[in-house]
Amino acid sequence: MSENVSSHIAIVPAAGVGSRMKADRPKQYLLIDGKTVLEHTVEKLLAHPQIAKVVVAVTEGDPYYPELSIALHPDVIRVAGGKERADSVLSGLNYVSAQLPCEWVLVHDAARPCVTLNDIDRLIDVCCAHPTGGILASPVRDTMKRANKENNIDHTVDREALWHALTPQMFKTQQLTRALADALQQGVAITDEASALEWLGETPALVQGSANNIKITQPEDLALAEFYLSRERG
């Protein structure tokens, strides 16, 4: 583990509905081995020695969250989520700035329960020595095709410098807050935290992480996540 003993705060935007799962509830509340996806994710973050607290942004009136084991955990704080991911993250950042001042925050997808502590440790090590921060990422392995308007292949994209963006993504609290607030105010499309920093002209680090750190998006992803988690437990 990293020798850096400072504590950081993690923010988990969990206000999404996950319509592609075609389930009766948002994907973060689907079960894997008796626990919700969100519980697995938050517990994984809390297990890292350098993460002091986890701020979870959920929809106001969410009927599922109060029933979770993490809802009463002393190191888990609930804040109101927003319409878009960036709104939820900004809500978490505003809480952190007001109540839990810290230099760095890690933002992690609610639907990525398979992140490893070693990957988080490596991310923290790299980011704390980087002027901007960075993200976990995985190099693209497959041949990539760009489609034309008819959904036929237009050309093959050089994958040499292409990476899949994963999470957590770790940035300085004040800089990320400013980037997201300014981008939202100007109507800039922000798909992840790194894109907000890129919009400011920054160049975040790419920290190679495990491709097993999947985001649960489709129904078949649940079984794959369960496999990875069970293998991790041994």
UniProtKB/Swiss-Prot annotation:
Site entry (Positions MEP for the nucleophilic attack), positions: 159, 215
Keywords: Isoprene biosynthesis, Nucleotidyltransferase, Transferase
Annotated signal sequence range: none
Residues annotated as site: Transition state stabilizer: 20, 27
InterPro entries: IspD, IspD/TarI, IspD/TarI_cytidylyltransf_bact, ISPD_synthase_CS, Nucleotide-diphossugar_trans
Pathway, per record: Isoprenoid biosynthesis; isopentenyl diphosphate biosynthesis via DXP pathway; isopentenyl diphosphate from 1-deoxy-D-xylulose 5-phosphate: step 2/6
Superkingdom field: Bacteria
Catalytic reaction equation(s): 2-C-methyl-D-erythritol 4-phosphate + CTP + H(+) = 4-CDP-2-C-methyl-D-erythritol + diphosphate
Documented EC number(s): 2.7.7.60
Pfam families: IspD (PF01128)
GO BP terms: isopentenyl diphosphate biosynthetic process, methylerythritol 4-phosphate pathway
An example Gene Ontology molecular-function term: 2-C-methyl-D-erythritol 4-phosphate cytidylyltransferase activity
Family: Belongs to the IspD/TarI cytidylyltransferase family. IspD subfamily.
Function: Catalyzes the formation of 4-diphosphocytidyl-2-C-methyl-D-erythritol from CTP and 2-C-methyl-D-erythritol 4-phosphate (MEP).
NCBIfam families referenced in this protein's UniProt entry, alphabetically: ispD (TIGR00453)
Name recorded for this polypeptide: 2-C-methyl-D-erythritol 4-phosphate cytidylyltransferase
Organism: Vibrio parahaemolyticus serotype O3:K6 (strain RIMD 2210633)
Lineage: Bacteria, Pseudomonadati, Pseudomonadota, Gammaproteobacteria, Vibrionales
